[in-house]
């Protein structure tokens, strides 16, 4: 009976291009204005559904339903997203419904689950059910980059008695596997052939496109060993050339079916 409201709220949240960027930090918005806007949108949904709302200095949104006893159980979702990247057939920030699917950046990861968490708790309110323990829906803002939102939250808030995230198939998936956030840097290569090389927008996304500029004329480039249909070579003049690789992007947690453009 509330499904259309759920879909409308997911669409409202998807409309915010909330890519976390600590370089655009401002008071109350440590990850930039677009993430703050998405957080305010989510908190507005929670308030409308009957939650008591607040936030941890813009790091984490907090939506509470009081319980009979001290302590609370919680869910945690996040309103930040990875960059949309190229290759979309639709506007990634205008949610569309197609053949039973919802299309848009963040529909699955993790704005849709965030909205569903809020509606799950709101069901208790709509039925006049007061839970034994309080229910808290946490709304993170930095899951895709560094999880600094959670660390900040725990500095001044008690841990829930129990918490799970709808950002996976709970309970089969119940923890982060971790990641390596290293950076490989090369010293300048004298007389090197590579002038520039670009590709990825985020460390946890498999890039769909990569571009390399070489100080080598097209006539001297070796023939591709594989995936020739995914490579485009064009001359730039003055003995230079550009190679454009077209892969199949995706989330790094689901590499099956993707083609890493950088590896091409």
Protein language model regions, located:
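Midchain, well-structured core segments that form catalytic/ion-binding scaffolds
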Residues: 144, 150-264
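Active-site metal-coordination/substrate-binding segment of hydrolases
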Residues: 70-139, 145
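Short secondary-structure junctions
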Residues: 18, 48-56, 97, 194, ...
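Short hydrophobic/aromatic beta-strand micro-patches
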Residues: 64, 140, 215
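General beta-strand structural signal in soluble alpha/beta enzymes
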Residues: 54-57, 104, 137, 164-166, ...
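N-terminal helical capping/dimerization or prosegment-like subdomains
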Residues: 1-74, 81-84
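Hydrophobic residues embedded in beta-strands of well-ordered beta-sheets
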Residues: 61, 101-102, 241
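Predominant activation on well-ordered alpha-helical scaffold segments within soluble catalytic domains
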Residues: 11, 43, 115-122, 151, ...
């Amino acid at each position: 009976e509330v499904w259309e409201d759920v879909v409308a709220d997911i669409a409202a949240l998807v409309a915010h291009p909330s890519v976390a960027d600590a370089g655009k930090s401002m008071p109350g918005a440590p990850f930039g204005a677009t993430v703050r806007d998405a957080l305010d949108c989510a908190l507005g949904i929670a308030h409308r559904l009957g939650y008591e709302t607040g936030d941890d200095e813009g790091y984490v949104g907090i939506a509470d339903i009081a319980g009979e006893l001290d302590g609370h159980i919680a869910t945690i979702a996040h309103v930040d997203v990875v960059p949309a990247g190229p290759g979309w057939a639709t506007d990634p920030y205008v949610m569309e419904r197609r053949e039973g699917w919802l299309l848009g950046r963040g529909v699955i990861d993790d704005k849709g689950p965030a909205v569903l968490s809020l509606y799950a708790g709101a069901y208790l309110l709509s039925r006049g059910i007061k839970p034994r323990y309080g229910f808290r829906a946490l709304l993170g803002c930095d899951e895709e980059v560094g999880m600094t939102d959670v660390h900040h939250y725990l500095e001044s808030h008690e841990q829930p008695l129990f918490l799970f995230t709808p950002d996976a198939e709970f309970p089969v998936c119940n923890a982060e596997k971790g990641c390596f956030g290293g950076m490989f840097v090369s010293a300048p290569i004298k007389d090197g052939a590579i002038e520039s090389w670009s590709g990825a927008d985020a460390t946890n996304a498999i890039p769909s496109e990569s571009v390399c500029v070489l100080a080598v004329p097209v006539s001297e480039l070796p023939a591709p060993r594989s995936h020739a249909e995914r490579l485009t070579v064009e001359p730039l003049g003055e003995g230079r050339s550009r190679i454009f690789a077209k892969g199949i992007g995706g989330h790094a947690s689901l590499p099956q079916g993707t083609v890493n453009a950088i590896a091409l």
